[in-house]
Amino acid sequence: MSLWLLLLACLLTCLGQVAQKCAVENWRGADLSWSRKWRSPWLWLALFALGSGLLVWLLVLQRLPVSVAYPMLSLNFVIITLIARFVFKEPVDVQHWFGVLLVIGGVALLGQQS
């Protein structure tokens, strides 16, 4: 159950980050007032996802040691890098991909210890 909550916290946080990116992409080049920006559905999705992710994270911290749970959040780096590359078509260089592999290796190593 704890690992499912940890995964949910990661996914909600990533959803919030992606929604933030979509919100600012929609604002780019448009001369929008702050009241118009506040009505962006992407912004509200970001706030909801990040707020929900925070609440789920608090549940995770009640069930898992922070020394186990927090390093697992580095999976967000991996997920967001994949989304940046394949959804937003952002360039990702070889050094960045190597970092992603190191993060995956670190998470796997820490996951075996827990």
Curated annotation (Swiss-Prot):
What is its subcellular localisation? Cell inner membrane
Q: Which GO terms describe its cellular component?
A: plasma membrane
Its transmembrane ranges are 41-61, 64-84, 91-111
Some GO term, biological process aspect, for this entry: which one? lipid A biosynthetic process
Alphabetically list the UniProt keywords. Cell inner membrane, Cell membrane, Lipid A biosynthesis, Lipid biosynthesis, Lipid metabolism, Lipopolysaccharide biosynthesis, Membrane, Transmembrane, Transmembrane helix, Transport
Q: What InterPro entries does the annotation carry? A: EamA_dom, Flippase_ArnE, Small_drug/metabolite_transptr
Report the SUPFAM superfamilies cross-referenced here. Answer: Multidrug resistance efflux transporter EmrE
Molecular function (Gene Ontology), one example: carbohydrate derivative transmembrane transporter activity
Membrane topology term reads: Multi-pass membrane protein
Q: In which pathway does it act?
A: Bacterial outer membrane biogenesis; lipopolysaccharide biosynthesis
Q: Where is the EamA domain?
A: 39-112
- Family statement drawn from the similarity comment of this UniProt entry: Belongs to the ArnE family.
Q: How does it assemble?
A: Heterodimer of ArnE and ArnF.
Q: What does this protein do?
A: Translocates 4-amino-4-deoxy-L-arabinose-phosphoundecaprenol (alpha-L-Ara4N-phosphoundecaprenol) from the cytoplasmic to the periplasmic side of the inner membrane.
Protein name, as recorded = Probable 4-amino-4-deoxy-L-arabinose-phosphoundecaprenol flippase subunit ArnE
The species this protein belongs to is: Pseudomonas fluorescens (strain Pf0-1)
